[in-house]
Amino acid sequence: MIRTLAARLAAAALATAAALAQAQAPDRIVFATDWLAQAEHGGFYQALAEGIYRKHNLDVTIRMGGPQVNGLQLLAAGQIDVAMADGLQVLSAVEQGVPVVAIAATFQKNPTVLIAQPGTAKIEQLKGKPIAIASAANTTYWPWLRQQFGFSDEQKRPYGFSVQPFLADKTLSQQGFATSEPFSIEKAGVKPVVFLLADYGYPPYSEALVVRRDTLDKRRDALARFVLASAEGWKSYLANPAPGNALIRKDNPQMSDELLAFGHRKLREHGIVDSGDAKRDGLLTMTDARWRATVEFLKLTRLAKPDVDYPKAWSLQVVRGVKVLP
């Protein structure tokens, strides 16, 4: 009988230990970025490199995006838990009935820029002059530029994702990202003039963190810890990017130290991550007003579709509980 009691106690102890281990097991999150690893993803890699995700009981895998990767499709198919996407992409997904929702925003300023020739003093001077833009601009920032500055479609030139036409034609401006194309132009010996569209009121968030609606309902606590840990990672990365950059180079060996340093410097210089509402509410914050301003921009430029419940595209439930000040 004593042996039986001892066996039962041992079994109970093992069951308790197993239950505790299960309770303490880290929550697994697979997170897909929107491009190959770069400085723009630095805070997430920093959180991984410095064990910040582990500290918050998370087992996070970062999957690089790329030209053939559609993160929102992977998300809708249940192959990942969190996707990184531009705010306009999220609104477009909701237009199509995809049950996804943005829960945080990495970039308080959209990094889209117009890059002009040296000597250009104001963005208004680009009116009537040739500008190389990609076709995707027609449903994003180009209608906004037409409305804000009176640009016309006659100015548009095809953009082949190369800075060589800009370097060869001294009348040409082009699109770009603050952290990327200006670097290539400067390497060629030209100091371009860069106009960050967000500084002129272009409203969409960039690098929003997006989940499926059912994931938000079922895993809210894990998502809250993911956003909190990511915000802590970004604060650390902006201060000292070395740990995150080492992981970035591991994932993307083609990334140079020089471009990483340039990207990090421009993130700080332009306040892309830590400006605006982030100064008051913390890194990765979002506001209802900002999302509604983006929807209003779509309506004013006739890009919005009728009878779409656009507010379904974002939720402040998670990010309201996160306050990691820059």
Residues of each region from the PLM?
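Short, glycine-/small- and polar/acidic-enriched structural segments
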Residues: 24-168, 172-177, 195
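Conserved C-terminal helix/tail region of periplasmic/extracytoplasmic solute-binding proteins
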Residues: 289-326
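N-terminal signal peptide c-region/cleavage motif recognized by signal peptidases
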Residues: 16-22
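Pocket-lining segment of extracytoplasmic ligand-binding domains
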Residues: 88, 161-257
